[in-house]
Regions:
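C-terminal module of multi-pass small-molecule transporters
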Residues: 84-94, 107-111, 115, 127-131, ...
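Intrinsic disorder in cytosolic terminal tails and internal cytosolic loops
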Residues: 1-19, 203, 445-452, 480-501
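Flexible interhelical linker loops that connect adjacent transmembrane helices
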Residues: 11-14, 191-218, 260-275, 336-337, ...
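A membrane-interface helix-boundary motif in multi-pass transporters
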Residues: 172-184, 229-241, 309, 431-468
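Transmembrane-helix bundle of Major Facilitator Superfamily
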Residues: 2-196, 330, 338-339, 345, ...
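Transmembrane core module of solute transporters
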Residues: 19-69, 175, 212, 237-244, ...
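C-terminal membrane-cytosol helix-exit motif in multi-pass small-molecule transporters
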Residues: 132, 184-203, 218-230, 247-262, ...
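Structural signature of transmembrane alpha-helices in multi-pass secondary transporters
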Residues: 34, 63-66, 70, 97, ...
Length: 501
């Protein structure tokens, strides 16, 4: 590991505040809210579109506005947490996220909802890095880190699936607006808990923000994320899409160049030059590419092909959620203290890929219990074995003043991976479906059945791609994540644990 692993040895576990586990509950609650919100609105989107008069062309901005702001501003949010103080940034993010959620729930026009979703994404970009940073600096003993990151990784991995469940229940039994309003009471509880339990880090009030780095880095990320968001509806060769990718690459290249010269860089490059940490970032991005695309296909398959209601669709993901939590808290968290991280991450990716491969056999007549449930369980266990070690290993030994931006880099990998997965796998599915329908539609009377078969064919082809990408994630983890298992007791070079209030 590099210089970021240096620092004052961790204090003995006896010095840690016994209420730190209640602090973990607060952090986990906030993280669940952010991750859940990335998918909960998907279930509510058809109802919101009808209520607010959105067109098919602009409804995607309910999703795109959130992902653009979230993915584009994460590095800035992480550095703000380092400069201003983690607890203060965490509370500001919670309050802002709650206010934006209330605004979205009360939206009377499509534009008002789009603006609220963008604000949600902006405050999520402040909230998510500070949450992970607080976790990193609070739990430094290797055994405790395993338990804490097991819980955090379980929520980070299963939050999207939980979003489908909660979104389905709220949409069917209340209305779509409660998919946004639900964040308000969660945020209020988290703010009260944060003020009472979390330690106030001093921040660095005299430090300067790397403004050129912010403009270049955030601008590049926004262009890349927006490019992937537009790639599916417009096509990969559309001039706007190509221009966005080109601008994004140029800005990010300029960002890297500037970071080598900036007196106080937004993202110190030693963070991503570390082989193990870079491997964790890349593993996360690749794993999420497969996972996010799969969520989308399974949602459509259950609702369009199997004719599930929103509630039934959400509940169908419950075994996946339980499996992710089990893999993260009961397997990875117990083993990470004894085995190298890659010995969890690589088998986890293999397990998830096998689960995906089972889904490539889906047909219009497949059943949930026989054909879908076993695959979801395997995927969930595999993702649990990936997420927890990635979060724990990527943040291990990071200097406290860099914990926020390191946490932001992990979240950025996750967010950009999700954008790529949604765009890439959607394109594969759409192209494959169209080719199948063209080749097999010989009798107009069979149009409906052939179309359904074509849709499922497109899904299965895209799932093969997702499985291949998941295997690539496992290969990256096996080759790049070279960290050894942490020893029991204080970790050498770990940051000093912070106390809860």
């Amino acid at each position: 590991m590099d210089a970021t692993r240096t620092g004052e040895p961790a204090r003995a576990a006896a010095d840690a505040d016994p209420r730190r586990w209640w602090g973990l509950v607060v952090i986990a609650l906030a993280q669940l809210m952010v991750v859940l919100d990335a998918t909960i609105v998907n279930i509510a989107l058809p109802s919101a579109q009808e209520d607010l008069g959105m067109t098919d062309g602009n409804r995607q901005w309910v999703i795109t506005a959130y992902t653009l702001a979230f993915g584009g501003l994460l590095l800035l949010g992480g550095r703000i947490a380092d400069l201003v103080g983690r607890k203060r940034t965490f509370v500001i993010g919670l309050i802002g996220f709650a206010a934006a959620s209330a605004l979205g729930g009360a939206a009377t026009t499509a534009g008002m909802l789009f603006a609220a979703r963008a604000l949600q994404g902006a405050f999520a970009a402040v909230l998510a890095p500070s949450a992970l940073s607080l976790l990193t600096t609070t739990f430094t003993d290797p055994k405790e880190r395993g338990k804490a990151f097991g819980i955090y990784g379980a929520l980070a991995g299963s939050g999207s699936a939980i979003g489908f469940i909660v979104g389905g229940l709220l949409t069917e039994y209340l209305n779509w607006r409660w998919c946004l309003y639900v964040n308000v009471p969660i945020a209020v509880l988290a703010v009260i808990g944060a003020l009472a339990l979390l330690h106030s880090s001093p921040g660095h009030p005299g430090a300067r923000l790397d403004v050129p780095g912010v403009l270049l880095g955030c601008g590049g990320l926004v262009a890349i994320v927006y490019g992937f968001a537009e790639a599916q509806p417009r096509g990969w060769t559309d001039p706007l899409v190509l221009a966005l990718f080109a601008v994004g690459v140029v800005l990010l290249a300029a960002f890297v160049w500037w970071q080598t010269r900036a007196p106080v860089p937004l993202l110190p490059l030693h963070i991503i030059k570390d082989r193990t940490r870079a491997g964790c970032f890349l593993t996360m991005a690749l794993a999420v590419i497969g996972m996010f695309g799969l969520f989308l296909f399974m949602t459509y398959y259950l609702q369009v092909i199997l004719d599930y209601s929103p509630v039934m669709t959400g509940l169908a993901f419950l075994p996946l959620t339980v499996a992710i939590i089990t893999g993260s808290t009961q397997i990875a968290a117990r083993l990470l203290d004894h085995v190298a991280p890659r010995l969890l991450m690589a088998p986890g990716a293999l397990l998830a890929a096998v689960g995906m491969m089972l889904l490539t056999g889906l047909t219009v007549h497949s059943s949930y219990a026989a054909d879908i449930l076993p695959a979801l369980i395997l995927m969930g266990l595999g993702m649990g074995l990936i997420f927890m070690p990635v979060f724990a290993t990527a943040t291990a030994g990071v200097a406290p003043q860099d914990s926020g931006v390191t946490s932001a880099t992990i979240n950025t990998s996750q967010q950009v991976g999700g954008s790529i997965g949604t765009a890439l796998l959607n394109t594969v599915a759409t192209t494959s479906s169209a080719a199948y329908i063209t080749a097999h539609l010989t009798d107009p009377a069979q149009r409906e059945s052939v179309t359904r078969e074509g849709i499922v064919h497109g899904y299965t082809v895209a799932i093969w791609w997702a499985a291949a990408i998941m295997l690539l994630a496992g290969l990256v983890a096996a080759l790049m994540v070279t960290a050894k298992p942490p020893k029991h007791g204080a970790a050498q070079g770990a940051p000093v644990p912070e106390q809860v209030a």
